[in-house]
Amino acid sequence: MAGAGGGLGVWGNLVLLGLCSWTGARAPAPNPGRNLTVETQTTSSISLSWEVPDGLDSQNSNYWVQCTGDGGTTETRNTTATNVTVDGLGPGSLYTCSVWVEKDGVNSSVGTVTTATAPNPVRNLRVEAQTNSSIALTWEVPDGPDPQNSTYGVEYTGDGGRAGTRSTAHTNITVDGLEPGCLYAFSMWVGKNGINSSRETRNATTAHNPVRNLRVEAQTTSSISLSWEVPDGTDPQNSTYCVQCTGDGGRTETRNTTDTRVTVDGLGPGSLYTCSVWVEKDGVNSSVEIVTSATAPNPVRNLTVEAQTNSSIALTWEVPDGPDPQNSTYGVEYTGDGGRAGTRSTAHTNITVDRLEPGCLYVFSVWVGKNGINSSRETRNATTAPNPVRNLHMETQTNSSIALCWEVPDGPYPQDYTYWVEYTGDGGGTETRNTTNTSVTAERLEPGTLYTFSVWAEKNGARGSRQNVSISTVPNAVTSLSKQDWTNSTIALRWTAPQGPGQSSYSYWVSWVREGMTDPRTQSTSGTDITLKELEAGSLYHLTVWAERNEVRGYNSTLTAATAPNEVTDLQNETQTKNSVMLWWKAPGDPHSQLYVYWVQWASKGHPRRGQDPQANWVNQTSRTNETWYKVEALEPGTLYNFTVWAERNDVASSTQSLCASTYPDTVTITSCVSTSAGYGVNLIWSCPQGGYEAFELEVGGQRGSQDRSSCGEAVSVLGLGPARSYPATITTIWDGMKVVSHSVVCHTESAGVIAGAFVGILLFLILVGLLIFFLKRRNKKKQQKPELRDLVFSSPGDIPAEDFADHVRKNERDSNCGFADEYQQLSLVGHSQSQMVASASENNAKNRYRNVLPYDWSRVPLKPIHEEPGSDYINASFMPGLWSPQEFIATQGPLPQTVGDFWRLVWEQQSHTLVMLTNCMEAGRVKCEHYWPLDSQPCTHGHLRVTLVGEEVMENWTVRELLLLQVEEQKTLSVRQFHYQAWPDHGVPSSPDTLLAFWRMLRQWLDQTMEGGPPIVHCSAGVGRTGTLIALDVLLRQLQSEGLLGPFSFVRKMRESRPLMVQTEAQYVFLHQCILRFLQQSAQAPAEKEVPYEDVENLIYENVAAIQAHKLEV
């Protein structure tokens, strides 16, 4: 009856029937169960429980449960237990459950309870949205019957403990009022008929609050650094911050971080970016905070200081790498070392920052600005140019240095300046110096050279504008300043141009001031000589010569020189004796004549007995006096003297006044007067008088006659006397128109031989007349003869006796030196055919100064050869003959620059102690000889030889130098004396023989004292002209002294056989004779070997005529 599947309606009907039909005695119905309770409900079951009815024996008892849904469905169950679960129900349905007890077929009353099954849970519960304070949930209605009248319940619990419940009739709900960033557990159920479904749960997190204070911390060319503060609300632990930057070109970079700062890199330079930042936790993002920023542009490239002035600095740069620099702005910031600062901007890639302080260091920063963001800065230090130096001027100048000074430039910071000095000479070449001082001395400059100086200040590499000044060094002093000539109103000076460049462009100034005066006079000249005129006679002048170039005066060379006094006047001999001559003259009319010294010089012009006294000294004698008269004493009787008088002051002599005067002859002594054998005459013998005499006059008894000079000491017969008589006899000595009568002697004649004497007298008379006619005709014939034309055959003069040399010179001087020309012509071809192969070799060409002056092979002086140096044994030098040796001298050319070393090798190898130099290094603007000795004490080295100047003595016409030659390898020395004659022009002759003779005497004295060592080395320029003349003069004067002979022609020919062109010009050949003649005039010594005195033809004629007349008188 109560089987499964039975419906409640049937049961009800049955119950009702039972109740209504219960008529018999039936068992009592059990009590209904007590406390019927719904224990649980599910979506498909309802669990009920109840208590056993009162008094019911549970044995054989059965409980019926019938649940009828609101949809009409019924489920029935029975059980013996006091609980039951009715399943198979529909979810979410309202059921009426009836429970009764049936025992023994008897049902108790029904206990009823209305309840419902639980609805199905909601479907597809999901979080629809989350904010920082709410979570939106949605779901779908549960499976099952119509959800009408259903209620949805939501319960949530946050991780911070916050909880709550919400309900809704909809399928979505937004739970708000939540804490941000919190995890919430949501439980969702459906409530219907008072029964809730099982819960659907979801966890959901509220979004965080947005980050706070989002800002851009930094921007670089490839990154943007952002920072923010944690959101308000809950602890952001386990939260992630998301950053997304999107550029204006669409490029996006995203970064996640748990920190509150991030650097987004990998961005493009100079680009605008929109950066979004949000918080993410449990997959929930907060709202986005946005900031717009830009990356920094790349820095400018190649920032360069383009120009600097004293008030501005120009900068240039290149646009930065990266996107188009349009809309970029360039900023420039500068700070000066004085604190001055400023900022400029430009849209260009260059800028000039002006109004700056001069000479200041500025730090420049340049950046690119784009989108309000500046690039990193490029910096450059640059200094404005200092102002130009002030008051640039020359402080001092020498021949090798110029000292400049200046004032610091205007400006606020003159310290730490470096000053640069650049100078260029007019010969080219530039030097640069720098200094931190306001002065500098430029050294090692060329003398007499114009230099252009540029001076500028520099600071930190910035140069100020230049200040320029042109200044010349001081020219060197002129050298070899000497007095060449002088008169009573002029002084001629000569000098050598200063050492240094540009000699041709020098001008020279001469200043002179007379003694006692203070106002000098000056005169300029472009040459190296000058003659000062209109000077006072007999006055001392202080002379100063300097070179000038570029308007700068050179160093002074000074000389004290005097004009000659005027010559004395009215020179006369007042009285004379046989041993003295009294001279008298008038003093010159000069202002200083009271200070004059007068010199009297006398020399014998000879007398017939001169050759008989080899011990006599006929050299000029000189004496001085302060008076205008002088008695010359200790003279030789009967001698013709040449007297010369001149005034002197300051060692300068006036022109001379001369006269010739003879001393009276000496008286003779009649030593014998004997009668002839016939008694018609006497034989007189008288002594020869001392000194000179020309003839004698005899007077015997009033009878007079003449005898020649040779009659003294011989018996002279005086005839025509009467026998046996006494006659007074005197002898008159005749000399130069003067007569001196001897003491009278009485002679006695014998009485025999008158007739014989007369005959002999007549015969002698006729003979003498014949001789007289012969000599007179011969003399007239010689006078009438005219000179004949010379033919081509010349007679070569041999050695000439000293006493004939004057005549020889006078004869050759006739017709414009025609005789000398003949002799010199004969010398022209001497030696030309000899070999000169060594000198002509190609390796030796450069060693020859002149191509036509080459040494002969046989006479050249060879040097010791140097290994593997062809031609090293050659020098243009020749051995020359002398008086005693074929190699008494060495003649050589003046050294060339390339042969100076060879020259000193020659000196060393020949061990020569003597050098004779007859040229100046520079003559007429041309180099004649290299300056081969040191200029000062600093030695010069040539190969293995070192030359040192030990001493120097400068005289008017020559200089003597002491040199020391050191062989470095052998450590041996050689002393050398150089005699440098400076008054002999090339191809010419000195103005007077006197200076050369004085030079020769000094040289010969040295050579006589220095016998050891090699031959003297003599040179001029070519080594033939002046060199040959001096060698010939030395040899011939020594020949004169030793032999009394002179052979100029022979010796010159002999020299030319050893070296070509010796005595190079006819003028030098004539001058050689003039020097010898002058030497003879200065010397009274006769050669010892000569006994026969010199007599010219006219004197011989005179003496013969005088003899004839004397014999005529005798007759």
Curated annotation (Swiss-Prot):
Active site: C1020
Stretches in topological domain Extracellular: 28-754
Notes on activation and inhibition: Regulated by reversible dimerization. Dimerization reduces its catalytic activity.
EC number: 3.1.3.48
Subcellular location: Cell projection, Microvillus membrane; Apical cell membrane; Cytoplasm
InterPro entries membership: FN3_dom, FN3_sf, Ig-like_fold, Prot-tyrosine_phosphatase-like, PTP_cat, RTP_Phos/Ushers, Tyr_Pase_AS, Tyr_Pase_cat
The keyword Disulfide bond appears for this protein: yes
A GO MF term: protein tyrosine phosphatase activity
Tissue: Expressed at high levels in the brain, spleen and liver and at lower levels in the heart and stomach. Expressed in pancreatic and colorectal cancer cells, but not in normal pancreas or colon. Expression in hepatocellular carcinoma is related to the differentiation status of the tumor and expression is inversely related to tumor aggressiveness.
Domain Tyrosine-protein phosphatase: 820-1079
A GO cellular component annotation in the UniProt record: nuclear speck
BP GO annotations: apoptotic process; axon guidance; protein dephosphorylation; signal transduction
Topology with respect to the bilayer: Single-pass type I membrane protein
Principal location: membrane
Subunit-structure text: Homodimer; disulfide-linked. Interacts with LCK. Interacts (phosphorylated form) with GRB2 (via SH2 domain). Interacts (phosphorylated form) with FYN (via SH2 domain). Interacts (via extracellular domain) with CEACAM20 (via extracellular domain); the interaction dephosphorylates CEACAM20.
Stated role: Protein phosphatase that may contribute to contact inhibition of cell growth and motility by mediating the dephosphorylation of focal adhesion-associated substrates and thus negatively regulating integrin-promoted signaling processes. Induces apoptotic cell death by at least two distinct mechanisms: inhibition of cell survival signaling mediated by PI 3-kinase, Akt, and ILK and activation of a caspase-dependent proapoptotic pathway. Inhibits the basal activity of LCK and its activation in response to TCR stimulation and TCR-induced activation of MAP kinase and surface expression of CD69.
Protein name: Receptor-type tyrosine-protein phosphatase H
Gene that this sequence comes from: PTPRH
